[in-house]
Amino acid sequence: MVLPSMNKSVEAISNNHLQQPNKFPLINGLADVRDYYVANCLLFKLNKGSLRIENEFGEFIEQSALCLFLLEKDQTITLSMSEIEGHIDFSSLEVSYDLMQKFYKVFYSTRNYNDRELSLKTKPKYFFHADLLPGMSDTFDSILHGVACPRVCSNVSIDDHDYSYFSLMYLISAFVRKPGGFDFLERAIKITTKEKVYNIIISDLTRKWSQAEVAGKLFMSVSSLKRKLAAEEVSFSKIYLDARMNQAIKLLRMGAGNISQVATMCGYDTPSYFIAIFKRHFKITPLSFMRTMNH
């Protein structure tokens, strides 16, 4: 995701994961995206239609437009989208770990003690929704439309004094004092070994990563890496697959290339194998996904 900035020291909203507004041709009024791994905190604005989000913990939320969602990182979700009066339209912004750390420091320093205590006593929530108050929709769209995004984008940073920085902080503030909001923020600034491995792999998917190479990047032995991942109940191969499939979704949705090109960019040697893996993972073929998202 590319946001205008002069400062390269702070990761912006990460890796060109800006999703442009989409309108869906739907079968029986529904469109699903299954088993999507949320790698970074995600702001999701529903402009038309209705949306149900469910994660692997059994938590779910269902709302109709107009509203804004905030999704926690490091969870696997299913999105079920329904048209209303023939329409569904949404946009999303992915907020990096580094940027969430900065927001946390600001919100924590201005916290109300009782609000924070209430939040920490609340059952963990992995996503929230907020009605769009005056100015929120325009603020979201100004960030979205202020992005100059080429077909395949590089990492670009966001300055602490950039307009987009304060705009995002304003949007996220709508969720902070909701029950569970501070707890959400405190989890957002923690990073697991799984996430560290994911970030290394997705930094260059054309490379054939081995566990030894990734362990070296993390300054640990292969056995230590395996032990840490086992403690988090995840395997190296599962993380590798999530990184490839997430990138495939984003590239296909951006229209960054044909299926063969996307397969190569995601580290697959043959398009046929990529298609089989994609279909097995998302329960839809890459071609059907492209037709749906880029209609």
From Swiss-Prot:
Please name one Pfam family that this protein belongs to: HTH_18
Q: Does the keyword DNA-binding apply?
A: yes
DNA-binding residue intervals: 212-233, 259-282
The record's listing under PROSITE patterns reads: HTH_ARAC_FAMILY_1, HTH_ARAC_FAMILY_2
Q: Which Gene3D superfamilies match?
A: Homeodomain-like (1.10.10.60)
Give the NCBIfam families listed for this entry: PRK15044.1 (NF011618)
PANTHER family in the record, alphabetically? HTH-TYPE TRANSCRIPTIONAL REGULATOR GADX (PTHR47894:SF4)
Role of this protein: Positive regulator of the expression of the invasion-associated type III secretion system encoded within SPI-1 (pathogenicity island 1).
What name has this protein been given in UniProt? Transcriptional regulator SirC
Q: What species is this protein from? A: Salmonella typhi
**Which gene name belongs to this protein?**
sirC
